[in-house]
Amino acid sequence: MPKFTTPQLSWLTTLGKEADIVLASRVRLARNLKNLPFPNRANINDLAQIKELIIRLIPAIESATGLKFDYLEIDKLTHLEQQVLVEKHLISKKLLTNPENRLLILSQDASVTIMVNEDDHLRIQCMASGLDLNTPLAKAFAIDDAIEAYLNIAFDEKMGYLTACPTNLGTGLRASVLLHLPALVMTQQLSKIVNISPQLGLAIRNFFGEDNAGNIFQIDNQLTLGFK
């Protein structure tokens, strides 16, 4: 494991399309390995096996994306280092609940991260500056294909990709954009958009909590399971 250095977020240091409103675009994939229990039901040996399997695939992930990756074992980090990763939204607080055999794989520009053994065996997250879902989507699918070339992924012909949380069942995909919306907050119009968003299959939430801090909001899809 490399020595910890504070990750520099490439999507924050460059300007993308519609950057005056759209700060970043994100795609996340949830995946699990076949015939292994979800992390919340797995024992120490299961979690250690999953961690080692994914570490071995880093060269394949690098080849698929053209990026250089490092990995961090969460239980080997100091409390401060762990909090830096949380504050930069590179890991979830839940990953710290029981850090043993938990892993973060991240590209050197931090545009791609993979949490290992959080809710699911794999949480692949890809970011891009501005309004650009195509770039992170292509990276996420490339990583997904690279992993599936070596490991069997939990998949059901009717239900799709199997996930720990039913809300991710199906595609396991969440696409979101990070928006700066001060005018809607000041004119008190945001609540109207929030109220109709479920009708569009979308969810809107404040990026920093409940008090509209920074007037920054995340909009993502609610539906991951297909229907006829």
Model-identified regions with their sequence ranges:
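Conserved phosphate/anionic-ligand binding catalytic regions in large, soluble enzymes, centered on
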Residues: 160-177
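Long, Pro/Ser/Thr-rich low-complexity/intrinsically disordered regulatory tracts in eukaryotic proteins
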Residues: 1-158, 173, 187, 191-194, ...
